[in-house]
Amino acid sequence: MENLEINTNTTPPITIVDQLLEMDERTLAELLIRCTQTKFLKPPKGKTEEERTENYKKIEAEFNQEVDKILQIYKKHGLVKELMEWATGFTYDDISHYVQHEYDLLKRAAGFYGIKPRAMETLLDLERVIFEHWMQYLIEKLREELEKHPDKFDEIAKSLDEHLTSEEKEQLLKVLKDKGLVSKEISNLQGRALLETILTAGSGTGVLLGLGSAGFGVYIALTKTIHLIFTQLLGITLPFAVYTTATKTLSLLLGPLGWIIFSILMVIPFIQHARKKKTALLATVFVPTIYLAYIEKQLQKGEGA
């Protein structure tokens, strides 16, 4: 399995608390809601695409209201404290005291995927491994959903053609060619070819993880691709501006739709069991979000952002 080419050799070691403190307050508030409020787990209801889209807008409005409420109560340190208290099950006044429990919470998240931590593995190394398995799990779920709804394939391919810009398609095509995942004879990347590549290339994660090393622009294009795929599966239509104004991966993944997507596929099966739900949320929401935020910062720095 390919890894994102990001240097993790840092001194002193990066902690989860450090990473959370690097995130902006709104992102922290959105993450806190994702981890603690199960009322946003349900998909938007409706018999038609219009009804589902309208109900999604109501969910989005309520979600943003909850974020605003939290931001009126907590500043950054308070948000980090609330997140770490939820993640570890311990309560401390000084957020630095949560660091002693970080390995245990990562070990618990790793166990969701059957991962056993290796000797001499840093916290960031373990985060990366969890993130890789999260990606693999996500693509496997995508395959399962398309097997249930094969008629969606053409709709998704069309949506990719319409929403990805020419520049984004060129960026993706170049990386796919460099990795030998599509023929060098192809001059124009179509939505169908992109979707087939994501579904069939190795474990399904090689494309996703490998593209991350190609730069921030490609990373955003990739995220838009995944988001578009699942939006179509849910039968929701979003304004084109949602994708043209996206400036970072987390702006797509942490919003209410991202919350719904990942919860439906990954967390709902564990809702009836409180301990399993907590483990599922650590493995599919908490750790991947923190690592994605870290990746984004590294990629932005690499492009002089």
Annotate the PLM regions.
Residues 1-204:
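Terminal export/targeting leaders at protein ends
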Residues 2-34, 216-224, 242-245, 262, ...:
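Anaerobic metallocofactor- and corrinoid-dependent redox/one-carbon enzyme cores
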Residues 180-257:
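Transmembrane alpha-helical segments and their cytosolic interface motifs
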Residues 222-305:
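Membrane-engaging insertion elements
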Residues 53, 60, 71, 110, ...:
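Generic intrinsically disordered, low-complexity segments enriched for polar/acidic and small residues
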